[in-house]
Each structure stands twice: as C-alpha cells, then as structure tokens.
C-alpha cells in the first residue's frame, strides 16, 4: 500500500497559487467586472471590444489602438481598459497591466466602483506576469476605494492573498484569506484556495475544515475534489482520497483535473508488472 508521504502531488491549476484568468466568471462577478450604472455609448463599445477579443483578438487590438488614439483626457480610460483586456487575452501581461493601470490613472473622478474594477484588473495582470509586488500595490489601491459591497472586497482580498503567498509573506496571506472568508463566505474559490494554503502550511486540520466548506458550496467542482483528495491522503485517509479523485474523473472526465486525479490514483494503485505484461 502506498503511504501518504509517498504520493507526489501533481499540482493542478487550482492548487497552484497562479493568477486566475483575468475574466474568469468568479473574477468578473466581483472586483474585476466592468460595472455600468446607466450604459453609455462608450460602455457598449467596451462590451463589444471584450466580445471581439474573444473571437478575433488581432482585430480587437487594432480597434482598441484606434480608440485610444482618438480619445482625450478621462475619456481614454475605457479605451485603455479595452486595450488591457485584449492584451490579457493575448497573454501579454505586462502590456495588459500597463493599460489597466493607465486606465485607472485617467479615470474620471466620482466613479469609484469602476476604478476599483480596473485596479483589480491591473493587479491580476501583474500577478499573471509574475510581478506579485506590483499586483499588491494595485490591490491595495483598489481596497481603498468604495468597492460596492463585501463580495467585491472579498474577491480583492483573495487576489491580495495570492500575491502575498507569491511574495512569501505567509502571515499577511493568512490575514488576507481570513478577510476574504469574512467578506465573501459564499464564494467556493475563497475556501478552496484557503484550504490549499493551509495544506501547504502543514495545517491539515484547518485544511480539512476549509475544504469541507468549499465542497458544501460547490459539491461538483473538480478542483475542489482534487484538493480534498490531496488533503485526505496526507492525513492518512487513503480511502477518502481515492473516493474524491474517482469522483473528479466521473464529474469532469476530459478535464485537466481528471488527468491529475488519474495520476494520483496511479500512485495509490500502481500497475503491477505482471498486469502490464499480460496487456501486451
């Protein structure tokens, strides 16, 4: 039988403290969404830019460049936000960060919700570009703005926690995760990443408690099941780990999480040489 210590973690995207996609559904619903009160022509153009970037980023990039060149003063903010989004789609993280940061800098006064969103986007771009120090500056600036509610603040605190982990500031990250849990208690990702952080900090008791909350909030999330299995096997509960990883393969058989779950299961139950020979 494989012992917990002998299982080599094969990290999945959810288990790594890598930046989330800038416009993943979770991020869009909170701090990095594009908030419109009463939509304007510029708002509609920004939405069209986001949609075009998904299908034809090259054309979207050209259109964004023209829009930025035509605008003046605070009117450049939304064109720059469009440009930042296109750069993010193209994985040009430094350029995306610069565009979002400039969009925040020239934004009109009196729109703190939008400023919070754009600063969050700048922070996520910096984090994706492996600049957690710059990301933290953007997130801290965003948190100084009226955020539109605790859920948005919770998302920013989660992003801030990821930056702090990348900077090796474990105590500060712990505080940021706690703030995210307080402000966004219904967000599964808050609990998932908190559990991962606790597990990596060798606090399996806390990790188990946190992953149970994530599982209750999102029982069919394959990344939650993957992390639950890792926590279980490290705690000596091999049967529970196997059950979690098998469920991941059933729930999302073609996903990256399912591939990782299979690798974990193979470590628990390695193929025997005689069975390999018989399969030839």
Give, region by region, the residue ranges found by the protein language model.
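Helix-turn-helix repeat elements of alpha-solenoid scaffolds
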Residues: 50-65, 89-102, 128-140, 166-170, ...
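Register position in tetratricopeptide repeats
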Residues: 89, 121, 128-129, 162, ...
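N-terminal leader/linker segments that initiate helical-solenoid repeat arrays
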Residues: 2, 14-82, 270-280
């Amino acid at each position: 039988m494989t012992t917990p210590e002998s299982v080599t973690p094969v990290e999945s995207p959810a288990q790594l403290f890598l930046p989330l996609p800038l416009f993943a559904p979770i991020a869009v619903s909170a701090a990095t969404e594009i908030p419109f009160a009463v939509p304007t022509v510029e708002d509609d153009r920004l939405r069209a830019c986001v949609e075009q970037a998904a299908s034809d980023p090259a054309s979207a990039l050209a259109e964004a460049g023209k829009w930025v060149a035509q605008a003046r003063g605070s009117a450049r903010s939304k064109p720059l936000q469009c440009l930042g989004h296109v750069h993010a789609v193209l994985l040009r993280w430094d350029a995306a960060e610069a565009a979002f940061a400039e969009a925040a800098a020239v934004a009109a006064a009196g729109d703190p919700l939008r400023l919070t969103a754009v600063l969050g986007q700048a922070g996520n771009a910096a984090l994706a570009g492996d600049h957690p120090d710059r990301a933290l500056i953007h997130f801290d600036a965003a948190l100084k703005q009226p955020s539109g509610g605790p859920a948005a603040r919770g998302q920013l605190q989660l992003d801030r926690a990821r930056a702090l982990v990348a900077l090796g500031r474990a105590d500060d990250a712990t505080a940021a995760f706690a703030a995210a849990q307080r402000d966004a208690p219904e967000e599964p990702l808050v609990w998932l990443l908190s559990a991962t952080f606790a597990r990596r900090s060798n606090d399996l008791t806390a990790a188990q408690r946190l992953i149970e909350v994530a599982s209750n909030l999102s029982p069919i999330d394959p990344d939650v099941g993957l992390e639950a299995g890792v926590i279980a096997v490290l705690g000596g509960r091999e049967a529970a780990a196997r059950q979690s990883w098998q469920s991941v393969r059933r729930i999302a058989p073609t996903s990256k999480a399912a591939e990782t779950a299979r690798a974990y299961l193979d470590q628990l139950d390695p193929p025997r040489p005689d069975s390999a020979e018989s399969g030839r």
